[in-house]
Amino acid sequence: MAVFMERPNGDGWAHLVSDLHGETGRVELRAFLKVIGVRRPLHRAHTYAEHCDIRGTEINRARNAGAELISWRELARLLRKKRHTENSVSKSQRLLSRP
């Protein structure tokens, strides 16, 4: 239940992600983007790697709004965890839907 921001790269861009998977994470990320005044579509929407690229003053607004700053390695770990969670949920849903 947090929004994380990868440390900005040399070009001044950063990735903003939610730690929650699925629709819950998507809603959290979109709500956060609305708070900081960013209106652009999410990249890789509906996947574990769903994120938004932000830059310049958007980065400052994200930090001021409470985004937790993480390294690219921490971001990779977070995305792997989300992928594992989504795969587990999908498998459970398939098993439950069998006749």
Language-model regions, residue ranges each:
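Catalytic phosphate/metal-binding cores of nucleic-acid and nucleotide-processing enzymes, i.e., regions
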Residues: M1-R98
